[in-house]
Design a protein with these regions (language model features):
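N-terminal, Lys/Arg-enriched amphipathic/low-complexity engagement segments
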Residues: 1-44, 59, 91-93
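A generic structural signal for short beta-strands and their flanking turns/coil linkers
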Residues: 27, 70-72, 88
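Short, conserved secondary-structure segments in the cores of folded domains
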Residues: 41, 47, 64-67
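Short, well-structured beta-strand-loop connectors
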Residues: 45-59, 78
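Short alpha-helical basic/polar micro-motif
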Residues: 49-52, 72, 165-169
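Short, charged beta-turn/beta-strand-edge "cap" motif at the junction between a beta-strand
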Residues: 56-65, 83
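Short, compositionally biased
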Residues: 65-81
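Buried, small/hydrophobic-residue-enriched core segments of structured protein domains
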Residues: 80-188
């Protein structure tokens, strides 16, 4: 175990209260290009298209088979591009009803296919270069980081504690599928 003696200490008062509130309805969400370093998108939607949670928005030209999906149900309001058509963002106007793409097959092969098909693989990173893995790459080990030490960051356990059984089942399924060690990093 490592203990850091020095670090960045920003004098900000207060901290997140550790609760999740349903008080505010979100009207728009965005998928931001700068969040995906080195990714070149091939758009699969246009302004005005209706999308569900998990609907494909675009595919990475550099890594065919890597899809980026919608975080909300709604209508594509705009696709924003910058200089030389660089991808800036997709804005989605959120609808009142929430629907998602349904997945019925739970075989190991189908799960591996769905990890890339529904954009889950974008949350995985290879080491040492922090790239999105190829869909057919088999990891030696998987590390799951539940530590966020950024100032005013929320403890990830707040989101997980309602679904901790599902999280644990997911870890066991990943271990079964990839036949590798799973390491979960968290703070006490």
């Amino acid at each position: 175990m490592y203990n850091l003696k020095k670090g960045l200490d920003i004098p900000i008062s207060g901290s997140p209260d550790g609760s999740i509130s349903d008080s505010t309805k979100i009207s728009h969400v965005g998928v931001l290009g700068p969040d995906y370093v080195g990714m070149k998108p091939t758009m699969m939607v246009e302004s005005g298209d209706k999308v569900n949670i998990g609907s494909k928005l675009f595919e990475d030209k550099k890594n065919p088979g890597i899809f980026y999906t919608s975080p909300a149900t709604g209508t594509i309001k705009s696709i924003n591009r910058g200089d030389k058509r660089r991808f800036i963002s997709i804005e989605i106007e959120v609808s009142d009803e929430e629907s998602q793409v349904e997945i019925y097959n739970d075989s190991n092969e189908a799960i591996i296919d769905n990890i890339s098909k529904f954009g889950v693989i974008n949350n995985f990173r290879t080491r040492p270069f922090n790239k999105t893995p190829k869909p057919n790459d088999i990891p030696e080990d998987i590390f799951i980081n539940l530590c966020d030490t950024n100032p005013l960051s929320v403890d990830p356990y707040i989101y997980l504690h309602h679904e901790i059984d599902l999280f644990n089942k997911s870890l066991l399924k990943l271990k079964e599928i990839y036949k590798c060690n799973i390491h979960v990093c968290y703070q006490n």
